[in-house]
Every structure is written in C-alpha cells, then in structure tokens.
Amino acid sequence: MTKWKRANPNGTRDYLFEECTLIEEVEQKLRLTFLERGYEEIRTPTIEFYDVFAFQNRPIDEEKMYKFFDEKGRIIVLRPDMTIPLARVIGTQRWDTPLKVTYSGNVFRANESHSGKYNEIVQSGIEVIGIDNVRAEIECVISVIQALQKLNVQSFTIEIGQVQLYKCIVKKLSIHDEEERVLRTYIESKNYAALSNFIGEKKLDRCDETVRLLEKLPRLFGNLEVIEEAEKLASSNEMKMAIARVKEMYETMETLGYGSYISIDLGMIQHLDYYTGVIFKGYIYEIGEEIVSGGRYDELIGNFGETLPAVGLAVQVNQIVKALQEQQEPYERNQIDIVIHYELNRLAEAERLRNLLRKDGKNAWLSLFSNLSDTFQFARKNKIGTVVEAKNEYLVEYVWNEKWVVQKEGETSCVTFKLR
C-alpha cells in the first residue's frame, strides 16, 4: 500500500521557502492591521462536528466536505468554512455586543478535479457582530482596504453586491428552489442568453418591472449609474431599501477617498446561502482571481443560539501571496556570509561567535559537518567566501582566493573577535 506515498492528495501542494515566508508575512500584516482597528482574535478547531455545517439549506455541499469518524463513531469534518464555526462560538455563549473578531486558519473544501482550485487554503478574516446598520459593512471594507494597502497589493478592487435584491426578485416571481439554483448560475456567470431563455421558458412577462430588473441584473455593474438604473425598476420598498444600502456604502467610501477601490455589481450572488444582505468580492486585476469574499449574514448565528446580526469577510491569503510574487523581484534565498566550523568541545565558543557576527549584520551559520574539508566543499557549493574554524586553542579564518587561504588568527576566548 505505497502507491501514493510520493504524491500529494488532489487539490493540495507543498509550500517551500519564499512562499512559506510570504504566507507568514501576509497573515501577520493582516492580523496586525485588524488588531489595530480593534478586532479581537478567535481560534476555532481545525476539525468540527459535521452537524455544525448541516443545518437548513446546507450552505456548504456535503460532497465538498472532508468527513471522517472520531473515536466514538461521530462524523467529524475538516472545517470547510471559517464563518460558520465562529457563528457557533458566538451563538453558544453570551457576549456584550457589538463585537469585532478576527481569525486566521486553513480551510478544507473538496473542489472538482481539474478545476484549478486548491482544496486547502489559508484565510484571514474579520467579523462585526451585533450591528445591523451600514456602519458594520463600511468598517469591514475600510479594514480590508487598509490591510491590502499595507501589503502593497496593487490594482485591486472591492465589488459590492446585494443578495437581498436577488432574493426579493425570486420571491416576487415565485421561482422555486430547483429553478432558483439554475437561475443563480446564469446571473453569476453573466450568461445573458441563458437568462433570456429562462425568462421565456417560464413565460414571465417581460413588461413587468421585476422581470425587467431580473433580466438586467447581470449587466448592473459599475458605478452609481448602476444604482440609478436599479432604482427605476425596483417594485417594492424592500428592493428599494436593499439598493439604498449599497448606494449609501458606495457614497461613503467615495467620501473617505476609497472610491477608486470600489465598484458595484448587483448581479453578484454569493454561492453560500447564509448571506442576507450586502455582499463583497475583491479581485486583483493581474491574476483575475478572488482575494476577498464576504457579506452580511443576519440569520446564521441564530442556528446556534440567540439571533444576532453580523457581517464579515475573508481574505484569501494564498491568492495574495500569488499576486505579491508576480509583483516582486524573483526570490533569492538568504545568502550565507560565513560558515563556522568547530570541534564539538568548542561549540559554546562557536555559538558565541555566531551571535556576535549576527549582531554585526553577518549571516553566520554553524557548520553541520565534522570534517573541515566537507565544510569547505559546502561553502564553495553555496558561494560562501569565508569559513572560520574554532579549534581547541584559537580561531582560524579562511577566505577563498582560488583556494582556501588563512586570513587571520585569534584566541578562542576572545569574544570580541571581529572579521574585516
């Protein structure tokens, strides 16, 4: 049973050197930005009971979850989402609200083979709990824009949508669940022809304002002109209020000087069913992939306890790293300046010398070889020009000049030993 021992499971990969460093840096900068804005950290387990994700409407397809059994035979999953476990934490305890929380961790979701998506990704995010007005959405968007700015992410945009508008249309036109799932894909993919055929097959009246709004929905993306178009076709107070929320957000962000980062897309519909109002997606132009997603979910926490309004968003750390790699110079591993070769009974002196050299700005390594010749060979292979040997009674510095030559000698006990 060793067929797969040299391979990674589908949708996973190894991260090496630069990517590990960048992932850590991105997570840390996001974390610090969110902490500076008053968010408090929450960590949830990597594994959760299946029941946490199995409530009404199943916001995450069962087939997308990695499932297994615990020692008592209960079904456990690798968390496929960060927001739902946070909703469990908030719903099962009593809190003083408003509450602002932040998190970071790995998410596991089985995507279709050859979809180009990874099944394990890193997400960092924020949630504002207990506030049902537009200030919560604005706080989230400001926070993520400032975080992306600090990461020096270039050419990004945050799209604002409104899932409540879509839900109002579906309700008013009495479209049942199966049809709604098909309709959703047409609108999300901006498949105008398929949407037009859907309206024809359903024999919907194209003169009706709501039907006209439905047909226009995938085209309603851009700036405030989009809002004006939607307002003309809104046939209920609920629709008008949903549109007004997006308008207020957009105008506020423009006033704050963030208008260049914001656009409107009323045809955007999140694939997770727990969203109830304003939704967000963020993109970087260069890679064309989603880097931010989220929205308002006023009914989710109620599945675990007291119903509380909430809004949040997640940053896709792996996609940020991909963008930063394309923006930056090719990665070079840290160059070693000096290798210290030592006899084992002189390790303490060698370690003191290493610390001293690092304080002087030198990248000094302790050799892992017992033979000096092997240390020399390692140094040459890695283009390191200096080797210091800590012998029984003294230090010897070797430099490469077509061959290894002795540069200077000093007493081992002399902690102030300096290289040129």
From Swiss-Prot:
GO terms for molecular function: catalytic activity, acting on a protein; histidine-tRNA ligase activity; transferase activity. GO terms for biological process: histidyl-tRNA aminoacylation; L-histidine biosynthetic process. Transmembrane segments: none annotated. InterPro entries: aa-tRNA-synth_II, aa-tRNA-synth_II/BPL/LPL, HisRS-like_core, HisRS/HisZ, HisZ. Pathway: Amino-acid biosynthesis; L-histidine biosynthesis; L-histidine from 5-phospho-alpha-D-ribose 1-diphosphate: step 1/9. Keywords: Amino-acid biosynthesis, Cytoplasm, Histidine biosynthesis. It is found in: Cytoplasm. The keyword Amino-acid biosynthesis applies. HAMAP family: HisZ. Required for the first step of histidine biosynthesis. May allow the feedback regulation of ATP phosphoribosyltransferase activity by histidine. This is ATP phosphoribosyltransferase regulatory subunit. It comes from Bacillus cereus (strain G9842).
